[in-house]
Amino acid sequence: MCAQHVADTSEVKWQKVLYERQPFPDNYVDQRFLEELRKNIYARKYQYWAVVFESSVVIQQLCSVCVFVVIWWYMDEGLLAPQWLFGTGLASSLVGYVLFDLIDGGDGRKKSGRTRWADLKSTLVFITFTYGFSPVLKTLTESVSTDTIYAMSVFMLLGHLIFFDYGANAAIVSSTLSLNMAIFASVCLASRLPRSLHAFIMVTFAIQIFALWPMLQKKLKAYTPRSYVGVTLLFAFSAFGGLLSISGVGAILFALLLFSISCLCPYYLIHLQLFKENIHGPWDEAEIKEDLSRFLS
């Protein structure tokens, strides 16, 4: 009987069904059970230099925060005249404005439908209102201690870096929140400057470096990658040099941070790919790829 049962079992082929009785034990595993197993079929194969290139977005924002803090320190110490910063920032904005249109040949402006006259009006309105409210900004936090202002500014700038849009499609990304946190930090720091003119120029500079500068960098990255890399390196060295003039230890730590993000982290990511094991097979959950929006109305 035992030999007959073994013969019957060998003749019957195992089927991957639950609705039919089969002459196999419950813990039986057939050789064909994993024949449809696939590993890492949707895994992205990263290239080291491509990851280094993408990390430049993070480098840009870190350098922006560093440059902003360095400029504020120079103004607070009286080493930088506000008129000089305003003139330099205005000239840089004009150059960036022209480059923004030249990079894509004006296609972006045509698609948005926005005219230069509209841009000029927006700029004049912003400068007028910011200058008018600069005395309010200067005295807004007089009742708050300086240590609290510094702590709030640090947390706001960290939040700006966390929520900034680096190009990832993630729920945590919020460009509006990131910009608002950076502007709030600039208002807090500007309130500790000597005069209302300093506060006005500091907030204006914050708009330039946290709102306008990333827009130009994004377009440079999309249309002229080589120029983008050159600008990123120049910006990083400028931030390092500015920080070095204030604190040698801080500059070294900042350089190590940039090196880790741009070189070590991409290498670690590539190394971790060797251990990636995503399995796929008929046991996966069904994926509905059809557009069902017509049934939701």
UniProtKB/Swiss-Prot annotation:
Pathway: Glycolipid biosynthesis; glycosylphosphatidylinositol-anchor biosynthesis. InterPro entries: Plno_GlcNAc_GPI2 (IPR009450). It is a multi-pass membrane protein. Pfam families: GPI2. One of its GO terms (biological process) is GPI anchor biosynthetic process. Component of the glycosylphosphatidylinositol-N-acetylglucosaminyltransferase (GPI-GnT) complex composed at least by PIGA, PIGC, PIGH, PIGP, PIGQ, PIGY and DPM2. Interacts with PIGQ. Interacts with the heterodimer PIGA:PIGH. This is Phosphatidylinositol N-acetylglucosaminyltransferase subunit C. It comes from Rattus norvegicus (Rat).
